[in-house]
Regions:
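Class I SAM-dependent methyltransferase SAM-binding "motif I" and its flanking Rossmann-like core
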Residues: 160-210
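Glycine-rich N-terminal segment of FAD-binding domains in flavoprotein oxidoreductases
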Residues: 40-72
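Glycine-rich phosphate-binding loop
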Residues: 144-169
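C-terminal functional extensions of proteins
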Residues: 199-229
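N-terminal glycine-/serine-/threonine-rich phosphate-binding loop
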Residues: 1-51
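Gly/Ser/Thr-rich loops at beta-strand to alpha-helix junctions
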Residues: 51-60, 155-158, 227-229
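A glycine- and small-aliphatic-rich helix-loop capping segment at beta-alpha/alpha-beta transitions
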Residues: 65-74, 97-98, 164-173
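Ligand-binding beta-strand-loop-alpha-helix segment within the catalytic cores
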Residues: 2-15, 26, 73-150, 202
Length: 229
C-alpha cells in the first residue's frame, strides 16, 4: 500500500525518519552538504573521516567536488569505502575502463576532479575485493568504524547489492558481510535501462557488495531516494 501513499500519508507515521525535499537536486545537495560538514568537523578534531559511498545515487558528487575545491577542504584524512562493483563471469572486477565500472566512475567523476593537493591518497579509496572478502571489515575495524553510510534504494529494496530474501530472518540478513553475489534479474534489467539503453545481455551477472552488517553498524545512515520507488 505504500506505493499509493501521497506525501502527507507517508510522513504521518513513517517507520524510519523521513525528509521530503523539493526535488532530486535538493536530495543530492543535502547529501553533499552532510559529507562536507562531517569532514570539516572531523578535520577540526584531528580525526579520520570514514564514509561508505555509493555509485547510485551519484548526483551528490559534483556538488561535493565543487565545495571541496572552492573551500580548499583537505581529504588527506578521509576514507571512501565504496559499496560495490560489478564482476566478470570469472568473479573478477570488470575492467576499470569499462563504462559500467564503479571504480572507473569514481576516478573520472570524483578523484580526478579534486585538486591534487586536497584529494585523499589512492590507498584511502577502497572497494570490496573478491580476492579478499574480509578487507572491508578489517579496514572498518582498524579505522574505528564508519561515520556515515550514504546510499540509495534499488527497485526491489536493495541497498548496495544486498537484497532481502524470503528464506532469511532479519537477524540473518543483518549478519551478512562482504560477499560475491549473482545479481537479480530485476536489478540487471533496471540497470541495463539506465546504463546501457536496455542492452540486458551486456549487463554483468555478478557483483561484489559490502554487507548489510557493515552498513547497519555505521554511526549514521543516509539513503537518498530519487526515483519512483
Amino acid at each position: 500500500e505504500y506505493y499509493y501513499y501521497n506525501k502527507e500519508e507517508l510522513l504521518k507515521a513513517p517507520k524510519i525518519p523521513l525528509i521530503v525535499m523539493e526535488d532530486n537536486a535538493a536530495v543530492f545537495k543535502s547529501m553533499a552538504d552532510e559529507m562536507v560538514e562531517e569532514i570539516k568537523r572531523k578535520n577540526a578534531l584531528g580525526e579520520n573521516t570514514v564514509f561508505i559511498c555509493p555509485v547510485g545515487p551519484v548526483g551528490q558528487y559534483p556538488y561535493f567536488v565543487d565545495m571541496v575545491n572552492e573551500q580548499n577542504i583537505s581529504l588527506k584524512n578521509v576514507w571512501f569505502i565504496n559499496m560495490d562493483e560489478y564482476l566478470t563471469d570469472d568473479k573478477e572486477w570488470i575492467d576499470k575502463e569499462d563504462k559500467l565500472s564503479f571504480r572507473g566512475f569514481m576516478d573520472r567523476t570524483v578523484y580526478t576532479k579534486i585538486k591534487p593537493e586536497l584529494v585523499m591518497p589512492e590507498e584511502q579509496r577502497i572497494f570490496p575485493d573478491p580476492k579478499n572478502l574480509t578487507h572491508i571489515q578489517d579496514m572498518i575495524k582498524k579505522l574505528g568504524g564508519v561515520d556515515i553510510c550514504f546510499g540509495g534504494i534499488g527497485i526491489n529494496g536493495h541497498v548496495a547489492f544486498n537484497e532481502a530474501s524470503d528464506t532469511m530472518t532479519p537477524d540473518e540478513f543483518l549478519a551478512q558481510h562482504t560477499r560475491v553475489l549473482e545479481i537479480s534479474k530485476e536489478t540487471r534489467a533496471v540497470n541495463s535501462i539506465g546504463d546501457l539503453n536496455g542492452a540486458l545481455d551486456d549487463m554483468p551477472h555478478y557483483c561484489i557488495t559490502i554487507g548489510i552488517n557493515e552498513i547497519a553498524h555505521a554511526r549514521k545512515i543516509r539513503l537518498g531516494c530519487f526515483r519512483d520507488w
